[in-house]
Amino acid sequence: MFRYDQVAHLTDQAYIDDLCDRVEQGLDQGLLPSHVFRDERVFKVEMDRIFTRAWVFVAHETEIPKSGDFVLRKVGLDQVIVTRSAGGAINVLLNHCRHRGTEVCHEDSGNTTHFKCPYHGWIYKNDGDFVGAPAMREAYGGRLDSKKNGLLRAPQVESYHGFIFTCLSESGPSLSEYLGDVSWMLDAIVKLHPAGLKVLGAPERFIIRTDWKIGAENFAGDVYHIATAHLSVNETKYISQDMRDTLKTGGGYRFQNGHGFITHRSSEMVGAEGGLWAYGLNPEIRKQFDLEGFDDAQKKMLLEAPPVAGNIFPNFSYLRGALPANAGDLPVVFTNFRLWQPVEPGVMEVWNWQFSYDALPDEYNREAYAAGQLAFSAAGLFDQDDSAVWEGVAKLGGSPWGRKEEVMLHYGQQRVEPDSTYEGKGDYFPSTFGEFNQENFWREWVKQLRSDVRNEVPA
């Protein structure tokens, strides 16, 4: 019998293999083909291979705290419903009716026991089980097997510190295996307070006409751009730090599977009381945090070179900083997580969540939300800068002249060696210069694109 997934690879396979070869060879020389940021064939294979096999963040448990709660999300190009069913189980369901395929859910969030298809009225429980259809006995004469007609369920769904991830491949690694040592970094971010993090409202969403990988690799490892792209922030009244100082204090943490985080050695910027407290946490807030549950390497990292931004491959990023909610106020720490959601070649949608620690006062959290939106949002000081320059990269990626000339982008700063005295997980590089985390991202990207879809097609 004809199977599209058994033959679809034939047209593009040689092209993708050749591109992967050129990317790998280019990285050895510090170069990257520019058209990887806007190529229809590349985009299609990314959706088919990376986003159906990687663990992708879809929601936080505090978004669906009660039985019946749901949110509508994306895994690559697939729209999914993330639900909490009776008993507290979390489900990730493909948002398409098993009858004729239309969407069964059209709300971004809500609470319900069932989903009803608006086309022919097929009904499903909020865990995806098929319940019935109008005149089912007359229409189908008992031939409709309810056990085989539920909404498609993601085969793997796991939560880590409240962050819900899904993997659409039954044969993929567990979430723990996929995260690997980067879980050590996530622990340090989330477990500063035993109550953990919570979302501060629904995610903001906005379009940037650029490739999803640009945001991901930037947050994973690009300290170098801050002194130039964000220099305009110096002219505002919201921040006292000179953006050019980041050239002296940057660094990065590299982890397996393409994950990476960046830091500013804030203890060098503001002295021994830097690190975690340099973010602007006031004494009353500091009292609520506890470092005793961390190992010695985590404590040292948090107090001397804490994570400022990072990316969990492929497209889930983190950022923490401090700005005043209003000009002239004291700075307030904000914690931001976001998805670089692919839409089409050269276009992504940013899904932007503000977080805070669950036990902190509501007044503080309101200020943290305002500070986070001021810095990173559709109208944020930093996102406006990034959007403007990132769009130019995607334009070059689609340039007929640039493609004809095989324009290569430069990823060849000095080769920096990891700090041999570092005792934490992963590798630590105490330097702004050196694109170790971007290279790490791209080598994982090549690895995923080389994973031939034929390997998972049943005989």
Swiss-Prot record:
Pathway: Xenobiotic degradation. Binds 1 [2Fe-2S] cluster per subunit. Its cofactor is [2Fe-2S] cluster; Fe cation. InterPro entries: Rieske_2Fe-2S, Rieske_2Fe-2S_sf, Ring-hydroxy_dOase_2Fe2S_BS, Rng_hydr_dOase-A. PROSITE patterns: RIESKE (PS51296), RING_HYDROXYL_ALPHA (PS00570). It is an enzyme of class 1 (oxidoreductase). It comes from the Bacteria. It catalyses: a 1,1-dimethyl-3-phenylurea + 2 reduced [2Fe-2S]-[ferredoxin] + O2 + 2 H(+) = a 1-methyl-3-phenylurea + formaldehyde + 2 oxidized [2Fe-2S]-[ferredoxin] + H2O; isoproturon + 2 reduced [2Fe-2S]-[ferredoxin] + O2 + 2 H(+) = 1-methyl-3-[4-(propan-2-yl)phenyl]urea + formaldehyde + 2 oxidized [2Fe-2S]-[ferredoxin] + H2O; chlorotoluron + 2 reduced [2Fe-2S]-[ferredoxin] + O2 + 2 H(+) = 3-(3-chloro-4-methylphenyl)-1-methylurea + formaldehyde + 2 oxidized [2Fe-2S]-[ferredoxin] + H2O; metoxuron + 2 reduced [2Fe-2S]-[ferredoxin] + O2 + 2 H(+) = 3-(3-chloro-4-methoxylphenyl)-1-methylurea + formaldehyde + 2 oxidized [2Fe-2S]-[ferredoxin] + H2O. Activity is stimulated in vitro by coexpression of a [3Fe-4S]-type ferredoxin. Its EC number is 1.14.15.38. Residues 55-166 form the Rieske domain. One of its GO terms (molecular function) is 2 iron, 2 sulfur cluster binding. [2Fe-2S] cluster binds at residues 97, 99, 117, 120. Disruption phenotype: Disruption mutant cannot degrade isoproturon and other N,N-dimethyl-substituted phenylurea herbicides. It holds the Pfam family Rieske. Keywords: 2Fe-2S, Iron, Iron-sulfur, Metal-binding, Oxidoreductase, Plasmid. Fe cation binds at residues 225, 230, 386. Belongs to the bacterial ring-hydroxylating dioxygenase alpha subunit family. Part of the multicomponent N,N-dimethyl phenylurea N-demethylase responsible for the initial N-demethylation step during the bacterial metabolism of N,N-dimethyl-substituted phenylurea herbicides. Catalyzes the mono-N-demethylation of N,N-dimethyl-substituted phenylurea herbicides to their mono-N-demethylated derivatives. Is active on isoproturon (IPU), chlorotoluron, metoxuron, monoron, diuron, fluometuron and fenuron, but cannot transform the N-methoxy-N-methyl-substituted herbicides. PdmA (subunit alpha) and PdmB (subunit beta) form the oxygenase component of a bacterial Rieske non-heme iron oxygenase (RO) system. This is N,N-dimethyl phenylurea N-demethylase subunit alpha. It comes from Sphingobium sp. (strain YBL2). The gene is pdmA.
